[in-house]
Swiss-Prot record:
InterPro entries on file: Tetraspanin/Peripherin, Tetraspanin_animals, Tetraspanin_CS, Tetraspanin_EC2_sf
Residues exposed to the Cytoplasmic side: 1-12, 77-85, 225-239
Top-level lineage group: Eukaryota
Compartments, record wording: Membrane
One GO term describing the cellular component: plasma membrane
Name by which UniProt lists this protein: Tetraspanin-9
This protein's encoding gene: tspan9
Predominant location category: membrane
Residues exposed to the Extracellular side: 34-55, 107-203
Keyword Transmembrane helix (UniProt): yes
Gene3D superfamilies for the chain: Tetraspanin
Entry's transmembrane regions: 13-33, 56-76, 86-106, 204-224
Amino acid sequence: MARGCLCCVKYMLFLFNLLFWLGGCGLLGVGVWLSVSQGSFATLSPSFPSISAANLIITLGAVIMVTGFLGCLGAIKENKCLLLSFFITLLVILLAELILLILFFVYTDNVSENARQDLKEGLALYSTNNNAGLRNAWNTIQTEWHCCGVNGYTDWHTALQEKVVPDHCCQDIYQDCGRNATNQFWTRGCYEKVEEWLDDNKHLLGTIAMCVLVIQLLGMAFSMTLYQQIHRSGKKYEA
């Protein structure tokens, strides 16, 4: 009976982490593709040039892959050392998420103001060489979200040092439309649009966050259950 419970928990944990590992592989592949094909894709912040969409996805994918690998190997080998490492890894990730969340809510105003200022400074890189990723990111954001600049279209006047905006700020996009009358531009800033979108989708984002939390807690519960089952059965892990 005990052995049957052990096998059940073992294979549940293995399948759980196999899906986890495959998801990490997928994210890592997407991150590498973005890095190779788009360069510094979506590197909107000049203060943190390494924080790009590609690098964030690669880092996230690598962490998920390593965590999933520890869980898979620990489960299939019934190795207490690996299972404990898996549990500790998930616990550290969970604590880091909670700390970041608390800091974000405590310093929301400071984070928001610094983000606005940093993004405005990043607009100056729009027309520079080797920043195709940044240009593509801003062009996509302004076209899809019907916005212009960080706080408004005048941000571009300061950044580009002349009274023009990128053509993707125009309500009807055509060559050099950014040099025409301002009544043809989207007037709302993109930062405001993003804040509005986050507010409109806060319930969806909260649900996703809860799902991630449940997955982490399940992984920790499965690993500790299997660890205890192995410990009680007296099985020694291999060095």
